[in-house]
Amino acid sequence: MTALKNDRFLRALLKQPVDVTPVWMMRQAGRYLPEYRASRASAGDFMSLCKNPQFACEVTLQPLDRYPLDAAILFSDILTIPDAMGLGLYFETGEGPRFKKTVSTLADIEALPIPDAQQDLGYVMDAVSTIRRELNGRVPLIGFAGSPWTLATYMVEGGSSKDFRKSKAMLYDNPQAMHLLLDKLAQSVTSYLNGQILAGAQAVQIFDSWGGSLSSAAYQEFSLAYMRKIVNGLIRENDGRKVPVIVFTKGGGLWLESIAEIGADTLGLDWTCDIGEARQRVGNKVSLQGNMDPTVLYARPEAIRQEVARILASYGSGTGHVFNLGHGITPEVDPANAGAFINAVHELSAQYHQ
């Protein structure tokens, strides 16, 4: 494989010295970019973008052609796994993801297959190897998956949910069924991420988007325990380099100490945490990724720059910080503001890496 020309993202994750704080954005390939909207129109719909490795590669690289980002992230969706389990993923315009089938009983869950990463999700592995080849060492490529709890909520609810009524009812009424579902998902995610690593992903992130909706006790038992299983089963070295693992629970600021114990290299933070406090709490164990409120990107460039400066100062000197948003960039953001954000991180962070 081609040598990396810019490895500061991987170095920061592993707490090795860097020249400036690396930066990338969750959903950096997305609807805020006119070139992405054009590609999506050419592909026909969102799933065609995901399932065609050439389109997935094209949109993964678009933000890198526009901005000096320090990492690329595979263009895909967390719901590829439930789709491969036979639930029939589709997208309603303006509605978000839906499933043709849901799971509601122990029998439904027992009948679910564990997808084979190469056979059932081969299009994702093809996308990873295509992107890695096209990147040609520019920056590292991040692979990703949803956490078991987050995937389970979509499978039980049949789509997005505000209150997770059905998923939580199953968790409390029928914990045996929920544990079986989460166990199958943990096995599926482990083999899926390992497939991505073998196809060329140089770091992986587990997105626990809905872990923060749980009580403390339920979070430990139904979300964190299964992420620990995944982390323990991942390939941690490939191609002569360590493969860092990032775990991101949105709304997980209460539980950073517990999350830092599961063996991941890096904790993702949402914008409700103070990154300086997070560093004091867990910085001796893990590196940190985050954590600007994505809606700051609707403000003027000077205000964006000020907020970047505040977060950098809060983290302080030294490595172990990858700058990111506290959640995904939203569709109405002006691409120029995203550029102002990325430039501000590089320009203002050099002083912290003398």
Swiss-Prot record:
The main location is cytoplasm
Its annotated compartments are: Cytoplasm
Sequence positions that bind substrate: R27, Q28, A29, G30, R31, F46, D77, Y154, S209, H327
Q: Name one GO biological process term.
A: protoporphyrinogen IX biosynthetic process from glutamate
Pathway membership of this protein? Porphyrin-containing compound metabolism; protoporphyrin-IX biosynthesis; coproporphyrinogen-III from 5-aminolevulinate: step 4/4
| MF terms (GO), sorted A to Z | uroporphyrinogen decarboxylase activity
InterPro entries attached to this UniProt entry: UROD/MetE-like_sf, Uroporphyrinogen_deCO2ase_HemE, Uroporphyrinogen_deCOase
Q: Which GO terms describe its cellular component?
A: cytosol
Report which reactions are catalysed by this protein.
uroporphyrinogen III + 4 H(+) = coproporphyrinogen III + 4 CO2
Where is the site labelled Transition state stabilizer?
D77
Q: Which UniProt keywords apply?
A: Cytoplasm, Decarboxylase, Lyase, Porphyrin biosynthesis
- Report the EC number(s), separated by commas if there are several: 4.1.1.37
Q: Which HAMAP family match?
A: URO_D (MF_00218)
> Which family would the database say this protein is a member of?
Belongs to the uroporphyrinogen decarboxylase family.
Record-given protein name: Uroporphyrinogen decarboxylase
Give me the gene this protein comes from.
hemE
